[in-house]
Amino acid sequence: MRVCGFSSGSQVASFVVGHGQHPDHTLFREGWVLLRPLRSRLVDGVVEVDVEVRRRRPQDPAPAARSVHHEEPGSAETPVVHQRVGAYAIVVSPWGVLGTVNSSLTRAPGTWALPGGGLDAGEDPADGARREVFEETGQHIQLGDLVSVQSDHWIGRSVTGVLEDFHALRLIHAATCQTPSQPVLHDLGGSTERADWVPVEMWRQRRWTRPAFEALSQHLERIAGQSCWK
């Protein structure tokens, strides 16, 4: 994945995100502070993400350090290095906000997450978000702005049992569903056990994964407030 930084309409930074590198850290080292994501797209088979930045100031604190959590620190097995770019959506409708429940194959079974997942090779992020939402929930969505870019790095087991040195890059979009229905899981046997609509005012009563909770805390109120159902 490539990140392109823009300030006052001009591109001022561009880099490919290496394995385990966090975009906000890289920008800070290059003299920029990440303000917000702008858009994502596919260019010559590579996912590109544009972000708005500003010049770093002497008083700006560095982004918080993030350690690499190892779920099996005593293992002699060599983990497989895997960086995955995924597309996700905060989907709102008259029925609430759309969530999925993690299956027993995941690191956090029973927790709630945002619908979405890894992009296929050569897939545009917007197309991937729509595909993943349909596969996990059966809902057809209208995709809006890119609202968050998340980066996490850990060592643990995949749903297939492989020990991975895993770097997750998540592109989270706002979305609406004009014709909500009872969610149906089409992608069986994977990381998602089921899906459901959660009333917006009750979303904090569910146990969400940390990435999902952070995204919802930062963006759900605004996304729901801008919908035609509020």
What are the functions of these language-model segments?
Residues 19-35, 114-147:
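The catalytic Nudix box helix
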Residues 42-48, 78-82, 150-170:
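Acidic pyrophosphate-coordinating catalytic loop
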